[in-house]
Amino acid sequence: MKRMLALVLLASLAAGCSHTRECHCRAYQKKYRRPLTGTAWQLIQLYGQNVPPEKGVFTVTLSPEEGRISGSGACNRLSGDYAADETRALKIGPLRTTRMACPELEQEQKFVEALTTTTHYDMDGPMLMLLCNGELRAVLQAVPEPNEK
């Protein structure tokens, strides 16, 4: 009987430990994860290269009601349509952009290309990863709300 009680207590302890780890992950996701739509996303990595703010601030926001995307590159604004579903499929475009010349125009064109070739997305905490057939194209970070700074 003591042996059975010891096994039950050990099993309960093990279950409690694994549950605790799971809760930490969920707490992280709950605290930092942002919804795909209605969140301002800022580009931090493009085709495997970090994008420092001095290279320009690249942002997008996906509107939940209208299926519209809007944002900006280093010097131009962009807008267009998008479609997303529960399987994390994401199609962006066609996009329209203003046509101002700027020093970071090549980077801006790569940003637009990454957006329009996106087939899927993934999310981890405050990060949004844009993928094209499984290949990572861009990583964006949720722009903090004014009360989060």
Question: What is each stretch, according to the model?
Answer:
Residues 17-149:
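Lipid interaction determinants
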Residues 1-15:
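Sec-dependent bacterial lipoprotein signal peptides
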